[in-house]
């Protein structure tokens, strides 16, 4: 079943730490995005890591990718995650959601 895999505690800690470092890196160095390899993390683990950091998930209607998710947290950047199953490209960026004011 899609997305039913549950991470072990050590794996969840690794993913949460990796996601937290990636978010800090995106903000500190003002880079556009970070690409993850499928050896690093899969889309569901990345989603779980962001949720563990207090971000709320919402889906996008953008059909260019297999997954295009938004994660929001009060007083924080919106985080966009997209995954292309053809290329295994998993990308995370800080973005402005269409509902947010610039």
Question: What does each model-found stretch correspond to?
Answer:
Residues 1-43:
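N-terminal trafficking/processing presequences and adjacent post-cleavage segments
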Residues 29-102:
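Acidic, low-complexity, intrinsically disordered interaction modules
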């Amino acid at each position: 079943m899609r997305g039913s895999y549950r991470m072990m505690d050590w794996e969840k800690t690794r993913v949460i730490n990796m996601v937290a470092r990636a978010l800090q890196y995106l903000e500190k160095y003002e880079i556009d995005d970070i690409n993850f390899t499928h050896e690093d993390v899969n889309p569901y683990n990345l989603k779980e890591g962001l949720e563990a950091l207090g971000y709320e998930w919402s889906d996008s209607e953008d059909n260019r990718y297999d997954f295009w998710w938004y994660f929001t947290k009060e007083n924080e950047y919106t985080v966009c995650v997209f995954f292309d199953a053809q290329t295994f490209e998993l990308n995370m960026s800080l973005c402005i959601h269409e509902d947010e004011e610039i």
